[in-house]
């Protein structure tokens, strides 16, 4: 079997609240780390989320 092209990643909040989203990305086309602006319900604002490893 071939290795899957999509991998699961964890998007950690940069606000320091500990909130995160789990999503997937194509490892072949998106080789750099992903950063996305999403809603953080702990601080009730849109903040930047950066990619981290799923432990």
UniProtKB/Swiss-Prot annotation:
It comes from the Bacteria. The lineage of its organism: Bacteria, Pseudomonadati, Pseudomonadota, Alphaproteobacteria, Rhodobacterales. GO terms for molecular function: structural constituent of ribosome. The keyword Ribosomal protein applies. PROSITE patterns: RIBOSOMAL_L33. It comes from Ruegeria pomeroyi (strain ATCC 700808 / DSM 15171 / DSS-3) (Silicibacter pomeroyi). GO terms for cellular component: cytosolic large ribosomal subunit. This is Large ribosomal subunit protein bL33. Coiled coil: none annotated.
């Amino acid at each position: 079997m071939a290795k899957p092209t999509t991998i699961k990643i964890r998007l950690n909040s940069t606000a320091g609240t500990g909130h995160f989203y789990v999503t997937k990305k194509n490892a072949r086309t998106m080789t750099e780390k992903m950063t996305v602006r999403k809603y953080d319900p702990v601080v009730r604002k849109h903040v930047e989320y950066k990619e981290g490893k799923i432990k």
